[in-house]
């Protein structure tokens, strides 16, 4: 629904509109779990939401794809979506990594606790490498891609994050749970979207929004990680104590 409104607002051309709808239909994936962990959210809730949404998308993605192609490209022919291909993509990029993590946590809990800090540091470094790598790989296309769909992709990310957090808080959930729901709502699996666009629908234009989104998503993720961790850092505590009379406390 958010993607549909943004497509109308920014007047996105048909091929990119279909790509945005594909992206919006995808679940969060391991990336959303990683970002939730780095943002000190409820990681267990994030993993559960990803697992459930990944299963649900087996049914919702084909429906959204068929509707999007018919609506935005004004075609009368109904495209056939191979659910088995979607299931294979989901297994590779979402369900298998989640299952491995849950098995390690269950059978090797001491090892999982011991590795928590090193994994957190490594995860942040991997995230940085991914951003740099994507930027270098797509350096020739960054400006054209962003000029076409940059604002709509960034808006999808930010609006979904804000709606997820606000809705969770209004429902009475705590801050950790709200962070998890926010990230799960606002961080889509760009890899899966690209796989569907190119591997199943065989249209590279459909993959452009996901490619742009992958860059903007990682940038907003780093901002979120910085904000959630800055509050607990020694520097932030010193600043807070120094300027406490002028500090506006965020009670959300």
Describe the function of each predicted region.
Residues 1-252:
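Alpha-helical transmembrane segments of multi-pass small-molecule/ion transporters
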